[in-house]
Regions:
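Short capping/connector residues at structural and topological boundaries
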Residues: 8-13, 25, 30, 35, ...
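Amphipathic alpha-helical segments that form coiled-coils or helix-hairpins used
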Residues: 1-19, 27-28, 125-128, 154-169
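Sequence-specific dsDNA recognition surfaces
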Residues: 1-9, 16-49, 71-72
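Amphipathic alpha-helical coiled-coil/heptad-repeat segments
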Residues: 84, 88-91, 95-99, 105-108, ...
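A short beta-sheet element
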Residues: 21-22, 41-98, 104-107, 115-116
Length: 169
């Protein structure tokens, strides 16, 4: 789970790191209106391109972050595994998302959220090692390409936004 980044503001002349909140996760990138946090936060709270991020409170969603390096705010999980590849846990999280949303909506009094116990109840089918290796040989390159294309698309959009005003004058 992320940090309450308002407690970790940049100090002095520190440039700061954009904060990844639900708004940024929805739009796929941080922008000039994104809050900043200190660069000295622990590494586990820093999100990089290709990290899987799950919003568990308010707006429930999961995405592969490709919006640049930023600090992970509270109400967001950085989803990782020491055993399984990114495509595997991303797709299983996405598979369960509709059910998580329904659970949060049923329990919502103000802002819906999902509890860890509900996440723990989510079942995942794990293939045998041979099948997993076969799936991985197909899925891993696809996910690497998706991430690469999304990063390139963001860079090209930024370049367009920078050059277009110059071309119009």
């Amino acid at each position: 789970n992320g940090l309450a980044m308002q407690k970790f503001r940049p100090q002095g002349h520190e440039i700061g790191l954009p904060v990844l909140k639900i708004k940024e996760l929805r739009q796929g990138s941080c922008d000039d209106s994104s809050e900043l946090c200190s660069l000295s936060i622990k590494p586990e709270y820093i999100i990089h391109n290709g990290d899987v991020v799950f919003s568990w409170s308010g707006s429930l969603l999961v995405d592969i972050w490709c919006g640049g390096t930023c600090g992970l705010n509270q109400h967001l999980f950085k989803v990782t595994s020491d055993v399984y590849d990114k495509w595997f846990y991303y797709l299983w999280t996405a598979h369960h998302l509709a059910r998580f949303i329904a659970i949060a909506a049923d329990k919502a009094t103000t802002m819906g959220h999902i509890k860890r116990e509900e996440l723990a109840k989510a079942e995942v089918l794990i293939p045998c090692e041979e099948d997993y290796t076969s799936f991985n040989s197909i899925m891993q390159p696809i996910f690497e390409l998706i991430i690469s294309n999304r990063i390139e698309s963001r860079k090209l959009a930024a370049l367009r936004d920078e050059l277009l005003p110059k071309l119009m004058t």
